[in-house]
Amino acid sequence: NDIITLTGNPDNPVRKSPHKPYIIDSMDNGVCSLTFMRAFDNAEIRVYQNGILIEQDSGFFAEGETYTLDLQGYGKGEYTIEVHYRNNKILSFFEEI
């Protein structure tokens, strides 16, 4: 094996920053939790069951705030949970219960 020694500083150092998600989602026994990792002044949460909008909520969500949705009350089905902010979908995930 050859040993290569590099000296000096690179002209353009590579900077990597870990990607922090804006929202962390989790599901436990039909209860969905959305934890906001930054504040959103007017975010909208949409819940679809089998492609039909069944719940919609919007408002201010503070950094560290957790929003919960009890999907068991709606019964079995395929659920899509979306979060929209400034007309952009920033989170979308699928669950089946």
Predicted segments with their positions:
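Structural beta-strand segments of beta-rich domains
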Residues: 28-34
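Residue-level detector of high-confidence beta-strand sites
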Residues: 56-58, 92
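Edge beta-strands of extracellular beta-sandwich domains
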Residues: 88-97
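Short, surface-exposed loop/turn motifs with a glycine/proline- and acidic-biased composition
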Residues: 60-82
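Short proline/glycine-enriched turn/loop motifs at strand-loop junctions of beta-rich domains
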Residues: 37-42, 74-76
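Conserved aromatic beta-strand anchor motif in extracellular beta-sandwich/beta-rich domains
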Residues: 47-49
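Generic short beta-strand
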Residues: 44-45, 81
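Transition segment at domain starts
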Residues: 1-27
